[in-house]
Amino acid sequence: MSKPTREEAKEAVRTLLKFIGEDPSREGLLQTPDRVINSYVEIFSGYGKDVAEILNTKFYETCNFRDFILLNIKFTSFCEHHILPFNGTVDIAYVPDNCIVGISKLARIVNIFARRLQIQEKMTVQIAESVQENLKPLGVAVKISAVHSCMSMRGVMQDNSVMNTMHYTGIFAEQQKYRHEFLNLTAKR
């Protein structure tokens, strides 16, 4: 599949404006196609980014503790089914084997996956598996809690529903005590 030109993308926005009954040539909408394309370039900037590059800088001398937990990483993504936003928080824990990364690296991983068309379940797995693959810890736990606009703005119109997804690898998948500790910590916020 070849990538459309910027002009083709702008024409697609004009077509959508016509589809909803708007006039793309009216004053307030003249610059809308450009603005939408510029927004999409930023919003969907996670494509083509390499998680391995982000996790390339590791610290080996500081791995004398048991758990590493980063809570409440905020994100906004877009559901691949309706291209509507969903936003929430990500909690990540891992038990280092021989290395750690700076905490900003975990937030960057979340941003890479959030800045793509997504479903929450897949994003949860992608984050956990990327940490597992690149850091090779004893285990990883990821929990995402999010509110989905596709449920609040259309369809069932449920604006207070929060979806929680979790994915575990290694000792978090194998040992209930690790999962329990992680879930207790994430529930205390």
Swiss-Prot record:
Q: In which pathway does it act?
A: Cofactor biosynthesis; 7,8-dihydroneopterin triphosphate biosynthesis; 7,8-dihydroneopterin triphosphate from GTP: step 1/1
GO annotations of cellular component type: cytoplasm
Q: What is its EC number?
A: 3.5.4.16
Q: Where does Zn(2+) bind?
A: 79, 82, 150
Q: Name one Pfam family in it.
A: GTP_cyclohydroI
Question: Which Cys-Cys disulfides exist here?
Answer: none
- Protein's recorded name: GTP cyclohydrolase 1
Organism, as annotated = Rickettsia conorii (strain ATCC VR-613 / Malish 7)
Gene that encodes the chain: folE
